[in-house]
């Protein structure tokens, strides 16, 4: 089958042919329709320090997808041939304390599709049936293909009650921009997002941001004053991994505020802990999606009117994958879709 793989220890990916995956007795085989390029895939493309330490070579990658079940293992129940599915990219052990307590998103033995094992940038993907998730007919293939990052945004944004609250989001990547739409959809009052990328800040405006602030030109304090915010933000969502953004977020929080961290900062990042302690802030780390509560919330929000369509900005046939990665690398894109229909 055709697949997009890391064949050598260096930058780039190669469209090549690999063996079709075998289907275990608890697995489903998915014929891929669409995939999306993730920030993780950009790290793999660049072959940065993280990728060099993490990604086996050779291996085909990718973990954002939608497709159709074409084969099932003999033990699989609850699915049928022809079901349209996406899937949870974190494969968990099922035996650790957190898994057995129903907290699979905290499994210490997690294996990542397209990171630690063969991925979805291929004509076919085999995953445990437990990880597959049926997509309702009213949700498009394009939106279903981005359920993985949409889930990151959902898990982060809905970690705290947002109704009537003022929310600060630092980092206008696709996940941060989707978090804007989620926060507004569930009833936040002011949703302010910061970045230095004007293209993505404009996407955030299209998704409903109260203010989208380029912090290289505009003061967040001035924006807060314009919005008559005299006490600070109630909820902060750190999506960038940039130390200066995290510092600004902590300085802008109200006493008793709640902060969710999805962005990954450098390991030795220093912060002013006085901002955390004396403000009584609550800080929560976010990794992946809650299985499968996050997935049900994603479907419910889309079915109740959440519009994520502006975040999908580019579409390419998989044979033009280099154009897709170029769009992502340019910084002037939202989500980029690769179509496998004619693969």
UniProtKB/Swiss-Prot annotation:
- Give the residues the record marks as binding Zn(2+) 2: 93, 96, 99, 107
Subcellular location as annotated: Cytoplasm
Keyword hit for GTP-binding: no
The record's listing under Pfam families reads:
ADH_N, ADH_zinc_N
Q: Which InterPro entries match?
A: ADH-like_C, ADH-like_N, ADH_Zn_CS, GroES-like_sf, L-Threonine_3-DHase, NAD(P)-bd_dom_sf, PKS_ER, Zn_alcohol_dh
| Cofactor names | Zn(2+)
> Which coarse location class describes where this protein primarily resides?
cytoplasm
| One cellular component (GO) term of this entry | cytoplasm
Gene Ontology BP terms: L-threonine catabolic process to glycine
Q: How is the cofactor bound here?
A: Binds 2 Zn(2+) ions per subunit.
Q: In which pathway does it act?
A: Amino-acid degradation; L-threonine degradation via oxydo-reductase pathway; glycine from L-threonine: step 1/2
Query: What residues make up the catalytic site?
Result: 40 (charge relay system), 43 (charge relay system)
Q: Which domain of life is it from?
A: Bacteria
Q: What reactions does this protein catalyze? A: L-threonine + NAD(+) = (2S)-2-amino-3-oxobutanoate + NADH + H(+)
- Known EC number: 1.1.1.103
Kindly give the SMART domains that the UniProt entry links to this protein. Answer: PKS_ER (SM00829)
The UniProt record gives the binding positions of NAD(+) as: 175, 195, 200, 262-264, 286-287
Residues that bind Zn(2+) 1, according to the entry?
Answer: 38, 63-64
Q: Which Gene3D superfamilies match?
A: Medium-chain alcohol dehydrogenases, catalytic domain, NAD(P)-binding Rossmann-like Domain
> Which NCBIfam families does the entry mention?
PRK05396.1, tdh
| Family affiliation | Belongs to the zinc-containing alcohol dehydrogenase family.
Function, as annotated, reads: Catalyzes the NAD(+)-dependent oxidation of L-threonine to 2-amino-3-ketobutyrate.
| Complexes and interactors | Homotetramer.
Name of the protein in question: L-threonine 3-dehydrogenase
Q: Which organism is it from?
A: Burkholderia mallei (strain ATCC 23344)
